[in-house]
Curated annotation (Swiss-Prot):
Transmembrane stretches, start-end: 4-24, 29-49, 63-83
Species this protein is from: Myxococcus xanthus (strain DK1622)
Catalysed reaction, written as an equation: a quinone + NADH + 5 H(+)(in) = a quinol + NAD(+) + 4 H(+)(out)
EC number(s) per entry: 7.1.1.-
Any one Gene Ontology molecular-function term assigned to this protein's record: NADH:ubiquinone reductase (non-electrogenic) activity
Protein name: NADH-quinone oxidoreductase subunit K
GO CC field: NADH dehydrogenase complex; plasma membrane
NCBIfam families: PRK05715.1-2 (NF004320), PRK05715.1-3 (NF004321), PRK05715.1-5 (NF004323)
Subunit structure: NDH-1 is composed of 14 different subunits. Subunits NuoA, H, J, K, L, M, N constitute the membrane sector of the complex.
Gene it is expressed from: nuoK
Biological process annotations from GO: ATP synthesis coupled electron transport
Described function: NDH-1 shuttles electrons from NADH, via FMN and iron-sulfur (Fe-S) centers, to quinones in the respiratory chain. The immediate electron acceptor for the enzyme in this species is believed to be ubiquinone. Couples the redox reaction to proton translocation (for every two electrons transferred, four hydrogen ions are translocated across the cytoplasmic membrane), and thus conserves the redox energy in a proton gradient.
Membrane association type: Multi-pass membrane protein
Length: 100
């Protein structure tokens, strides 16, 4: 049986990689992927604690986070496509101004 510490260390590493991607990258798609990585790290933490406690609450929470992440990805991708069609770029520094 794998100790919970390993799961939590993996979740922390995934979350840090996602945070690094959000803070450093300039491409909107990479930022969305980094946010998804951070949400998956939270899911791993929920499931690890649920396994440790022996209940299903963490699994239910992870399921809802997955549903919210899917909606966020769909809406975010639609916004990125709309911005790319209107401006021709998806770099975040080009999106700082709201002027067309």
């Amino acid at each position: 049986m794998v100790p919970i510490t390993y799961y939590l260390l993996l979740a922390a590493a995934l979350f840090c990689m996602g945070m690094f991607g959000v803070l450093v990258r300039r491409n909107a798609l990479v930022v969305f992927m980094s946010v998804e990585l951070m949400l998956n790290a939270a899911n791993l933490t929920f499931v690890a604690f649920a396994r440790m406690r022996g209940d299903n609450l963490g699994h239910v929470s992870a399921f809802f986070v997955i549903a919210v992440a899917a909606a966020e990805a769909a809406i975010g991708l639609a916004i990125v496509i709309a911005v790319f069609r209107s401006r021709g770029s998806i770099l975040l520094e080009d999106l700082r101004t709201m002027k067309h």
